[in-house]
């Protein structure tokens, strides 16, 4: 009995103890607070998580840096040359002295230059462009002035028809040898016909276009010819001849059919020089503006080089001019100066500083004819504003005697005078009373150093020339460009070149 009671008591105590434990576990630590003494260096949970995140990012970056980067393709310029030949009309040799021209300055540093380009006689726009393009003198290419007589009573002002050019221009020379060529606004490059017209040329010249517009138009056509975006307004041109020539010439295969000769003429500097004079602020501002337009053009060309040019092509930039510019003091109306009586027996084709006089309606008797011409020459000699040269008196170095287009007498004005069609009260008058031009050109460079012009030649990444050039002439430009393109000059062209690689 005692043992049974003891067993019951033990069981009761065990039950009570178990119930107490259950009650404690059920109510948990409610009401019980634990505190921890902070130690130096303790961090919050947020800080620890942020450090872990940053460590994970750093490990990822290190892994990326360890990866080998893709090799960058670099143009070494050891492929074919692509020549961009830009002629800037009226770019006088001293214009850079008072103009901000970072682009021209860079060309001077990276390549070669001279402000002593001595143009061939006559120092006029169309003859000079013809001389540069053909590598021959006016007696051979036939462009003896900006206004020429092609026959009795047939006068062409600012000739544009390429058929008037009597020697092969470089756009034909290059195309014939497989070089795809674009030529815009270069005198006598319009309306090309024959077997080897340039791949791209214009049918007409727009005198109102700015340099920026001309550059953009050429760039659009260049892009289109390279398989890029079509030009906004595609110019009329001949566009298939280069492909036919390309298949037959090694020079073409080097270019893969892409353009390798681009030729342009820019006019803004000449225009401002004529209107305001060569030393006017407006003229220097035009030099700066053209410099900026060229910088933008060539920055774009280089940015798109892999599309525009053949693989590893070397960009050659050739900047030339046709002539400089002199201050104009007086205009001369030659018909007014000679008078109606003398003009009955003369056709005169005059432009700027040069006039070609052709006799007409002379006496049939040789003796009478000789007497008449002698009297005529005597009257001409009384006019002090120009010198009169017979055909046999033309300086040989001018190479000016063309059998049909050079006059029986050549009149060359003094520096500072220009022939004009406008008529004033007197035959000699101020520019403000005539065309309102204050710049003149056409004078022999040996008489007016202001006819001298600027030349730059540089290449990227490899320049074909470095350092300062001395005096250079225009006759060598054709052969120089041919040499850089790896082709032969035209038959009859001067073969001397600038000292290019």
What are these regions (language model features)?
Residues 350-480:
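Active-site neighborhoods of enzymes that stabilize oxyanions during catalysis
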Residues 14, 24-39, 136-231, 249-278:
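His/Asp/Glu-rich, glycine-adjacent segments
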Residues 212-216, 223-226, 271-315, 378, ...:
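A long, amphipathic alpha-helix that forms part
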Residues 314-364:
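Acidic/histidine-rich catalytic neighborhood
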Residues 78-92, 107, 132, 174, ...:
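Beta-strand elements within well-structured catalytic alpha/beta cores of enzymes
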């Amino acid at each position: 009995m005692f043992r049974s009671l003891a067993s019951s008591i033990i069981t009761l105590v065990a039950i009570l103890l178990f119930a107490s434990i259950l009650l404690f576990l059920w109510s948990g630590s409610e009401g019980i607070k634990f505190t921890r003494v902070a130690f130096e260096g303790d961090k919050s949970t947020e800080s620890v998580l942020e450090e872990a995140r940053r460590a994970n990012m750093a490990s990822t970056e290190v892994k990326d840096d360890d990866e080998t980067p893709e090799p960058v393709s670099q143009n070494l310029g050891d492929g074919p040359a692509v020549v961009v030949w830009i002629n800037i009309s009226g770019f006088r040799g001293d214009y850079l002295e008072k103009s901000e021209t970072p682009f021209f300055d860079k060309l001077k540093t990276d390549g070669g230059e001279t402000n002593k380009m001595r143009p061939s006689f006559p120092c006029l726009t169309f003859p000079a462009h013809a001389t540069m393009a053909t590598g021959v003198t006016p007696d051979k290419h036939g462009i003896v002035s900006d206004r020429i007589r092609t026959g009795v009573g047939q006068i062409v002002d600012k000739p544009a028809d390429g058929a008037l050019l009597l020697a092969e221009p470089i756009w034909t020379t290059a195309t014939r040898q497989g070089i795809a060529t674009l030529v815009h606004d270069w005198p006598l490059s319009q309306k090309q016909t024959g077997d080897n017209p340039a791949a791209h040329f214009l049918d007409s010249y727009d005198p109102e276009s700015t340099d920026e517009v001309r550059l953009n138009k050429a760039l659009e056509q260049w892009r289109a010819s390279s398989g890029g975006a079509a030009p906004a307004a595609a110019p009329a041109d001949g566009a298939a001849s280069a492909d036919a020539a390309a298949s037959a010439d090694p020079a073409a295969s080097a270019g893969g059919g892409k353009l390798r000769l681009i030729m342009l003429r820019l006019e803004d500097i000449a225009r401002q020089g004529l209107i305001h004079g060569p030393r006017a602020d407006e003229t220097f501002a035009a030099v700066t503006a053209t410099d900026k337009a060229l910088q933008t053009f060539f920055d774009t060309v280089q940015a798109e080089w892999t599309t525009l040019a053949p693989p590893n092509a070397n960009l050659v930039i050739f900047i030339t001019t046709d002539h400089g510019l002199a201050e104009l003091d007086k205009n001369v109306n030659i018909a007014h100066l000679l008078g109606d009586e003398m003009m009955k027996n003369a056709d005169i084709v005059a432009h700027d500083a040069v006039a070609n006089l052709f006799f007409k309606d002379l006496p049939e008797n040789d003796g009478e004819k000789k007497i008449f011409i002698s009297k005529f020459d005597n009257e001409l000699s009384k006019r002090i504003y120009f010198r009169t040269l017979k055909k046999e008196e033309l300086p040989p170095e001018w190479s000016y005697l063309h059998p049909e287009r050079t006059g029986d007498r050549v009149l060359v004005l003094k520096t500072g005078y220009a022939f004009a069609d406008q008529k004033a009260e007197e035959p000699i008058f101020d520019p403000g009373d005539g065309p309102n031009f204050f710049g003149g050109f056409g004078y022999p460079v040996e008489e007016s150093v202001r006819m001298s012009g600027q030349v730059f030649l540089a290449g990227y990444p490899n320049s074909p020339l470095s350092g300062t050039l001395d005096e250079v002439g225009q006759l060598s430009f054709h052969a120089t460009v041919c040499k850089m393109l790896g082709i032969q000059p035209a038959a009859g062209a001067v073969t001397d070149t600038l000292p290019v690689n």
